[in-house]
Amino acid sequence: MLQKFISKSNQSLLMRLLAENFKHQAPWYGIAIGSMVVVAVMTSASAWIMRDVVNSTVVSKDIEKVFGVAVTVAIIFAVKGLATYVQSIFLSKAGNNIIAHTQRRLFEHVLRQGLSFYSIYPSSELLVRLTNNAQAVRSVIELVVTSFIRDLFSLMGLLAVMVIQQPLLSLVSAAVGPGAILGVRVLTRKVRKIMELEIASIGQIIQSVQETSTGIRIVKAFALEDFMRRRMDKYIGDVERRANSIARLEAASSPIMETLSGFAIAGVIALSGVLVLQQGNTPGELMSFITALLLAYEPAKRLARMRISLESALVGVRMMYQLADHPIELTEKNSAIPLPEGPGEIRFKDVNFSYKNGERLFQNLNVTFPAGKTTALVGPSGAGKSSIINLIMRLYDPDVGSVTVDGHDLKDVTFRSLRDRIGFVGQDTFLFSGTIKYNISLGREGASDEEIIEAAKTANAHDFIMKMPHGYDTEVGENGIKLSGGQKQRITIARAMLRNAEILIFDEATSALDSESEIQIRQALARLTRKRTTIMIAHRLSTVTAADNIVVMEGGQVAEQGPQGRLLSQDGVYRRLYELQLLPSA
């Protein structure tokens, strides 16, 4: 019967939603539904007893019966009030549990995704789907429970009172039904289309706020305030217009229902007068019927509007499932084992690799990163340096071939054990909102304060930290906005120090720093890389002179490799890059 209230395209969506969520909250919904049945029965009883109220006071004028009826009315409304309270409490409990469950499930799914996923879903869209769309799940289920079960029970009970007492009047009242159904169906289709556009506009607002916040220096430097203001004004205006359109469409059901109900009530009053005056019906029966009819109006109106509200909320549910059903590209084998301890030799063997656009980057790539040695990756942009790092960290899998650590294929080991063996410092330093101590401690869970301080000292970060207002408890702001570039970089190095990993990866760790900061960070890196397998991506060749081995990438292939002295003695790619960067121009 519920399927009659929604479009065919949404029926399977609703059934899936109920199957996945309703059963987990069955005890709470069971109590709530039981309370709704009590409310429906008491509502019907309040209409039924109006017959005795009128007949005992107007017809029989029996004072004892009047007092008895008064006590019964008080009991009816007390029971109804208590049942309504219980219903509200357990509906809220179940609804809040559903939101929490949905958000945890979506966030876990997002965490398991590979990097390509984030090019499809920008952060603003993820925020909408984790908040608004999770709320939509609760809204749909509560609509089903309250508007369908509660209102349907109440309507059925009141209709029973009406039919038992006055079948003919009940038939007159039902004559308005087809008109109401047709009007609501037209409104529903319009609401669904506008709701999809409104949700997209909300995502644009969130994205604009994020971009303005994270790029505030660029906004100020290029005097983009007016541009950002105009863009935000457009997005807000779009949401406002669409919200107003939805409000108008939803409100349009009220005049439809009010007008049709007015005709029904007018017809009932006219016909009931004839029945009382000419056929001897008691005034109590008439009053009871009209009371039931008036009480039935509200649940009938809510049921009529339910389709509009349900279709609107299901737009958010559909978007939530689009995210929840997005396939996970990188998965861990059931037979995956923890990566055993070892020296940390990394080997690429006959690796073919391409990104989603289909253009092949590596073709039969073979390269080895010796254990305990520092290897520099150099070459022009687009040569594949960062892609090698992505494969080592298993952010992607090769199409063909294998990447191994100490002879273990990365596909055969667990994600956690692999990444626990790797310390990473990137060019684009990222700090989480929180304190300096918190950001360093992310390098290793459970690290003591002494270990955190020692890591900071090794990274040449301790001195500047102690000059901060609250030392290690100083808040860094969103993405470390309160710190300089060099300070942020040294904190990320301290984080890698604390990890104490056998494999270290540095992706242009000093490229954007001033000379003093670069010297301090180079000193920190020299201490950190001792006796560890280290891979350094560098565009500035001055940073790789001390590397044990230099791998020169060009066009997705290893063009040449060896220590710097040997590469400079050859007339190759490295020598050409070296002369361009480090030798004075003629």
Swiss-Prot record:
Residue positions binding ATP: 379-386
Membrane topology label: Multi-pass membrane protein
Highest taxon above the source species: Bacteria
Disulfide bonds, paired cysteine numbers: none
Record-level GO cellular component terms: plasma membrane
Similarity annotation: Belongs to the ABC transporter superfamily.
Protein name (record): Uncharacterized ABC transporter ATP-binding protein y4gM
Organism for this UniProt entry: Sinorhizobium fredii (strain NBRC 101917 / NGR234)
Native organism taxonomy: Bacteria, Pseudomonadati, Pseudomonadota, Alphaproteobacteria, Hyphomicrobiales
